[in-house]
Structures are given as C-alpha cells and as structure tokens.
Regions:
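Sec-dependent bacterial lipoprotein signal peptides
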Residues: 1-26
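Beta-strand-dominated extracellular/periplasmic modules and repeats
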Residues: 27-147
Length: 147
C-alpha cells in the first residue's frame, strides 16, 4: 500500500501545477490576426468570389485557418474562434469557390469563375507567410478558362 505523505502530496501538486503552466503557455499564443484580399491576375478585387472559402494549411502543425471572402473581396481568418487569425508559419493556401445557382430551382450551378487548380493544395501554388503580430495578405488568382 502506498501512503501519501505531505511531502509526496506537495510534490504531486507542484508537478501538476508545472504541467498546467507548461501546457497553457503553449496554447493560443501562436495565433496572429490575418486579414487579406483576393485579387484577379491583373489586380482587380475578386468580388465575384463572395462566399467562397479561403483555407490556410500549416502542414507541420496539422492545423488550418479559414475565412470567407466578403463582397469587397476581403477575408479574415479564424482558427479557434471568429477572426482570431492563424498560427505563424509558411502556409499552403487553397480557395473553395462558392458556385451560385444558375436557375431558380437550384438544380444547375453557374459556371466556375475560379481556375479549379486553386481548390487543390498540391496544385494551387498559393502560399502565405503568417508572422507574429497583425498580417495583411494579398492572394492573386486566375479566372477559369471558358469552355
């Protein structure tokens, strides 16, 4: 039978407190505000992509941050809570286009506006560096080819 003496109890409490401090110091401190805009090749704001999702993937931390493109072509990223930002590091970026309905019944999608390669992390070619502090990022994309 193991008896817990006051010394062992204090040692256990101290270890628990140190673990908790170490755990909490590593959580949440690496999220930094990120806002940005999506522009078409040539510089025009990609306002037509309103409602589409911007996704920042940080492979080494196996985490992602997401934002929704607004009517003015801008976005703000969220990781844990709304608009908190993204972890620092070199991110791979993709954009998931929100394709609108082409008819009132919602049975036909409008043609894609965005080149489909931007929906694939391996093909998009988009990267962004998030640094400690506030970040402003511009993502340049290309239109889908007319078929």
């Amino acid at each position: 039978m193991i008896r817990f003496t006051p010394f062992r109890q204090r040692k256990g409490y101290a270890a628990a407190v140190l673990f908790l401090i170490a755990f909490l110091s590593g959580c949440g401190n690496d999220i930094h505000p990120v806002e940005g805009q999506v522009v078409w090749k040539g510089g025009a704001l990609a306002k037509e992509l309103e409602g589409s999702h911007v996704v920042f993937e940080l492979p080494e931390k196996k985490t992602s941050a997401r934002g929704i493109i607004q009517a003015d072509g801008t976005f703000r990223l969220s990781t844990h809570k709304p608009n908190d930002g993204a972890p620092a590091g070199e991110h791979k970026v993709l954009i998931l286009e929100d394709r609108k309905n082409a008819n009132a019944e919602g049975t036909l999608l409008a043609p894609a506006l965005l080149d489909p390669r931007f929906a694939d992390l391996k093909k998009s070619g988009l990267t962004a560096t998030v640094k400690p502090g506030a970040n402003t990022i511009t993502l340049t994309v290309e239109r889908a080819q007319a078929r």
